[in-house]
């Protein structure tokens, strides 16, 4: 009964639990690859004149009555950003010793949170930063940054940390996203809709910051903000299993864990929007570097609305029943060449069957994703992969979805020319103006299993299909090359010392 109460409270059915335990039992299949996507194959790199047309298409779209939303996943704690500094606090030496520690203290006055940290040091240790460093008390400085009695950066989400310095003060990523939203996502009436997914314990802090700052950004950019929040739903938590694939129990209680960013497909599905931009909270730059980001956001949005317009026209034509063989061939070309969706079976179909197939493929949510040229190690990236219905389409895959024991697949992964910076624009209504139910377009067979421990006991955790991976598997997907300058994530605190964040 305790189990049943917990399930009821979370809104999880027993059938879901059975399904999840079966996933632990049988694992997840690897995806069959056709090729790594490249500029010749699946990634658009529009020439200057084409870019102009796409930018114009976006400007025209923004001036209609459509609803545009900027969606920013922002629930994760920033603790990973400070992993090295937490290790320094626990180390058996007092002075900065590793390269990381030295870089942090050498650049300390360059951080946007320096002034706040100075105040916290005085409050906690009675001295400012130079004073503490001068007497070799480096750990007091780090403690003031990370601990609750100080700035509490070790427990806050990235969106609320000071990232960038300006003449008039410092900005958090939340504020940088508000600025960005005004620059490329303002609708006809100058309204900017920004939606953050946050964790329950931080929601109030986000609200306070918005209440404090939204007015000044609205004034600066001549826009009106509509800022909303949601939380990951408890019903998307997944059950943990023991090594025998039985439900893991912690003191007799079933253990549930958050299902990863794939759970946010539910939050996305709840938005009332026509077009949704998605970008991670920590991928922001100061205003002086925003031009590229804004240009390429408008560009991929322009590609999206241009493709959507053509798709809708073809769907209307197929609906009318009044089309020629040549028109059906034209639509097939569009699906294969513009939407990169191929099916070896299509050549055997009569026109009427082909029309049904095309209608099914066209009438789906659509996304255009920016892709950046690989500079370092291959990571998650763009591939042409086989779907369960035998078609080949574009997918964003993580390395865990690729069979590295298969030489051909491994080579495709290693030779991949581009990676996924998480830079998407999504179209979520059909040609009749109805919202797609996004839950219907998830490929459930694309989750993955990770190994964790709880109180010293090993457990298996189930990650849902990633938001831009399997959760959007059955969308029409198009990739566009964007420059590295649009990708500036902050993985560690010292990333803030990089030129792009100064």
Which functions belong to the PLM regions below?
Residues 372, 381, 407:
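Polyanion-binding interface signature
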Residues 276, 386-421, 430, 446-451:
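C-terminal, active-site-flanking charged/polar segments
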Residues 178-182, 406-409, 464:
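Short amphipathic beta-strand starts and helix->beta connectors
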Residues 1-39, 186, 349, 353, ...:
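Long, compositionally biased intrinsically disordered regions
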Residues 5-7, 11, 36-375, 384-396, ...:
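Domain-scale recognition of functional cores that engage charged ligands
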Residues 127-135, 148, 153, 282, ...:
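Conserved catalytic alpha/beta cores of large enzymes that bind or transform nucleotide phosphates
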């Amino acid at each position: 009964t305790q189990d049943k109460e917990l399930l009821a409270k979370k809104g999880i059915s027993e059938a879901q639990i059975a399904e999840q335990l079966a996933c632990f039992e049988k694992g997840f299949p690897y995806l069959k690859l056709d090729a790594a996507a490249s500029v010749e194959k699946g990634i658009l790199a529009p020439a200057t004149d084409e870019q102009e047309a796409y930018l114009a298409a976006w400007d025209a779209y923004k001036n209609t009555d459509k609803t545009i939303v900027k969606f920013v996943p922002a629930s994760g704690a920033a603790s990973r950003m400070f992993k090295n500094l937490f290790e320094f606090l626990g180390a058996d030496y007092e002075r900065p010793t590793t390269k990381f520690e030295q870089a942090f203290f050498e650049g300390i006055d360059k951080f946007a949170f320096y002034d706040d940290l100075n105040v916290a040091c005085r409050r906690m240790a009675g001295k400012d930063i130079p004073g503490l460093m001068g007497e070799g008390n480096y750990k007091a400085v780090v403690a003031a940054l990370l601990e609750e009695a100080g700035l509490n950066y070790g427990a806050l989400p990235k969106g609320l940390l000071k990232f960038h310095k300006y003449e008039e003060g410092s900005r958090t990523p939340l504020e940088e996203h508000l600025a960005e939203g005004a620059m490329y996502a303002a609708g006809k009436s100058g309204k900017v809709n920004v939606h953050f997914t946050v964790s329950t314990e931080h929601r109030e802090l986000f609200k306070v910051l918005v209440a404090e700052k939204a007015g000044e950004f609205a004034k600066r950019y001549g826009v009106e903000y509509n800022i909303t929040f949601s939380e990951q739903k408890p019903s998307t938590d997944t059950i943990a299993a023991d090594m025998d694939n039985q439900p893991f129990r912690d003191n007799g209680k079933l253990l549930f864990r958050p299902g990863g960013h794939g759970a946010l497909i539910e939050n996305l599905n709840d938005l009332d929007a026509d077009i949704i931009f998605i970008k991670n909270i920590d991928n922001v730059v100061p205003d002086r570097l925003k031009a590229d980001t804004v240009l390429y956001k408008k560009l991929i949005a322009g590609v999206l609305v241009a493709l959507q317009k053509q798709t809708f026209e073809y769907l209307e034509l197929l609906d009318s029943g009044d089309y020629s063989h040549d028109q059906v061939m034209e639509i097939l070309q569009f699906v294969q060449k513009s939407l990169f969706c191929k099916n070896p079976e299509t050549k055997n179909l009569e026109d009427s069957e082909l029309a049904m197939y095309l209608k099914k493929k066209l009438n789906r949510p659509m996304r255009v994703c920016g892709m950046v040229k690989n500079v370092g190690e291959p990571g998650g990236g763009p591939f042409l992969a086989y779907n369960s219905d035998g078609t080949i389409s574009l997918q964003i895959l993580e390395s865990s979805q690729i069979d590295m024991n298969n030489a051909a697949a491994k080579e495709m992964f290693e030779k991949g020319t581009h990676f996924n910076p998480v830079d998407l624009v999504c179209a979520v209504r059909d040609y009749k103006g109805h919202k797609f139910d996004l839950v219907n377009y998830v490929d459930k067979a694309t989750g993955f299993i990770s190994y964790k421990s709880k109180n010293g006991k090993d457990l298996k955790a189930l990650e849902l299909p990633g938001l831009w991976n399997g959760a959007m598997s059955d969308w029409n997907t198009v990739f566009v090359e964007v420059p590295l300058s649009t990708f500036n994530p902050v993985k560690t605190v010292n990333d803030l010392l990089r030129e792009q964040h100064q």
